[in-house]
Amino acid sequence: MIITRETDYALRILRVLLDGEKHSVAEMSETELIPNQFAYQILRKLSAGNLVRVSRGALGGCALSCDLDATSLYDLMGVVGERGILCACMEPGYKCRWQDKHGRCTIHCQLAALQQKQDEAFRAVSLRRLLTGGSNPQDTSKL
């Protein structure tokens, strides 16, 4: 799966924060149907990646701290620790026994080209566009 549950939950958390207000983890979890323990884990990553700001205490909560127009789906996936790779041989440093024995692998070359196109597409999609949608969900030309 290219978009994992963790990325999906991160997107849901950001969707709640679109209004610019502070929200509690409990509120976000309930609204977006995210288990509390996952919400806390993901918020730690989003905070470390400077996408959200977390404040503690009686007046605490979570708020958006990034420009959603300048942050891409690819960026978000990196923050949560995912690359969205098509297959294991796309991983940096992957050692392929088949290539070691036979040389150039046409399958790898084709998959690498697809991986590059996918990465470019994910970089081209701003989080704001992804989270707010459009009038026609089938139209991805503006993504």
Predicted regions and their residues:
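Key DNA-contact positions within bacterial/archaeal DNA-binding proteins
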Residues: Q37
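Non-DNA-binding regulatory cores of transcription-related proteins
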Residues: S65-L143
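Basic amphipathic alpha-helical segments that dock to polyanions
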Residues: M28, I42-G49
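Solvent-exposed interaction patches of small proteins and small membrane subunits
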Residues: V25, T31, R56, S65, ...
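Beta-hairpin "wing" of winged helix-turn-helix
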Residues: G49-S65
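N-terminal helix-turn-helix DNA-binding core of bacterial DNA-binding proteins
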Residues: I3-I34
